[in-house]
Amino acid sequence: MAQLMPDVSKYRPDVKFWMVFAAIGLFAVLLARPQFGSKLETVKRQGVEVMIALDISNSMLAQDVQPSRLQKAKRLVAQLVDKMENDKVGMIVFAGDAFTQLPITSDYISAKMFLESIDPSLISKQGTAIGAAINLASRSFTPQEGVGRAIIVITDGENHEGGAVEAAKAAAEKGIQVNVLGVGMPEGAPIPAEGTNDYRRDRDGNVIVTRLNEQMLSLIHI
């Protein structure tokens, strides 16, 4: 499926996201194994299971993507859920740790409620544990046979922990499609300091600038 997916640096986040969704939809149709012959038959798209791994580290508060990286990501996920049919969705949130925000479900109303409640305060430990998120997502699918499975990682890729590439390869070996959506700009942006009109600063008083780590994300894209 990698050849169907856009490079993480080529397109705006919303364009990339819908290319990801279209590719997953095509994968589901291929799983249905349509037979071609003299009789025209309608092939119903087989449902897929999609685990969203969403970065909620403080850098996702940067506003180089409006209204912020995190809010943009949440809006795109909500739009994806609205388009689902016969599919299941679950959500992993991660920063320095990763945990399940929503077990995989076909209850789209609940999915959007859980999505709305996501914010950086859910995880106090900072970092970008992409590998842990992918590993957790890989274990979160149902045991049902004959269904497509995909993980969509949404992150800026900054300050990532080790093991992300290895986790993506391990998931791919299980037949799980691993897709990465980079949110942010390579030029970077400061991180708003919550409750103030200022930005987060380092120990020397310098404004912290967070940048999209395109190079690392391209390695995870399996």
Predicted features and spans:
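Conserved small/polar residues in nucleotide/adenosyl-binding loops
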Residues: 220-222
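Membrane-embedded segments
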Residues: 33-148
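Soluble catalytic domains of enzymes that build or remodel membrane lipids, polysaccharides, and related
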Residues: 97-216
